[in-house]
């Protein structure tokens, strides 16, 4: 009799624990169902990078003075600066400039320390290729203007992961029913800019 009662007691405990574990697992599942997904339908949808995004480096050949500061501050000595000394002017003449993005870590040191601002970080991140040698950009490829997601009519730009509402740190925290997930900087400026009538009222109040 005691063994039978012990078996029933253990069975009830196991059933209770199983129900508790099932409830914990389903609670996590239903919690994620109420959240907004963070996946995008690439390449038909693309994220808008943030303002300080470190993408492909843009290079302006005419501004470069071949000082090689970018080479010295680069952690891996990546930029290749090909120059010759002009004996008449006693100045450097730049022949070629190249960066291998297959090795670049996009730290931005070359952009930060460039004395002539001939280097800049762009928002371009689509550098995939079938041949790694195609990632070695010369001064012509580096001088190409970057592509902009917001001006491409073939894709739908998404701002969810770049510009979140105030106080939100994780895109998962945005409810699925919320259609306004964030604002671009120019939209924030337009929203904060007072109406013309408000300015007139303020001026009239100050005069009175």
UniProtKB/Swiss-Prot annotation:
Main location: membrane
Organism expressing this protein natively: Prochlorococcus marinus (strain MIT 9215)
UniProt GO BP: photosynthesis, light reaction
The record's free-text note on cofactor binding: Binds 2 [4Fe-4S] clusters per subunit.
EC class of the enzyme, as a word: translocase
Keyword presence, NAD: yes
4Fe-4S ferredoxin-type domain sequence ranges: 55-84, 95-124
Listed cofactors: [4Fe-4S] cluster
EC number(s) from the headed UniProt entry: 7.1.1.-
Pfam families from the UniProt entry: Fer4_7
Name of the protein this chain belongs to: NAD(P)H-quinone oxidoreductase subunit I
Gene Ontology terms, MF aspect: 4 iron, 4 sulfur cluster binding; iron ion binding; NADH dehydrogenase (ubiquinone) activity; quinone binding
Lineage of the species this protein comes from: Bacteria, Bacillati, Cyanobacteriota, Cyanophyceae, Synechococcales
Topology with respect to the bilayer: Peripheral membrane protein
Residues bound to [4Fe-4S] cluster 2: 74, 104, 107, 110
């Amino acid at each position: 009799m005691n063994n039978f009662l012990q078996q029933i007691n253990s069975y009830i405990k196991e059933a209770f624990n199983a129900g508790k574990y099932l409830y914990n697992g389903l609670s996590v599942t239903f919690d994620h169902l109420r959240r907004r997904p963070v996946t995008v339908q690439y390449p038909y949808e693309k994220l808008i990078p943030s303002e300080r995004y470190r993408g492909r480096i843009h290079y302006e050949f005419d501004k470069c003075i071949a000082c090689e500061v970018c080479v010295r501050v680069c952690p891996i000595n990546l930029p290749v600066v090909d120059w010759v000394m002009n004996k008449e002017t006693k100045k450097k003449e730049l022949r070629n400039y190249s960066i291998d993005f297959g090795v670049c870590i996009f730290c931005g040191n070359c952009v930060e320390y460039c004395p002539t601002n001939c280097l800049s970080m762009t928002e371009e991140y689509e550098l995939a290729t079938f041949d790694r040698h195609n990632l070695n950009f010369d001064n012509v490829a580096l001088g190409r203007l970057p592509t902009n997601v917001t001006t491409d009519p073939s894709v739908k730009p998404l701002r969810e992961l770049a510009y979140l509402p105030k106080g939100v740190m994780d895109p998962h925290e945005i409810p699925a029913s919320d259609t306004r997930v964030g604002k671009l900087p120019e939209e924030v400026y337009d929203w904060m800019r007072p109406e013309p009538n408000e300015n007139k009222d303020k001026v009239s109040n100050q005069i009175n």
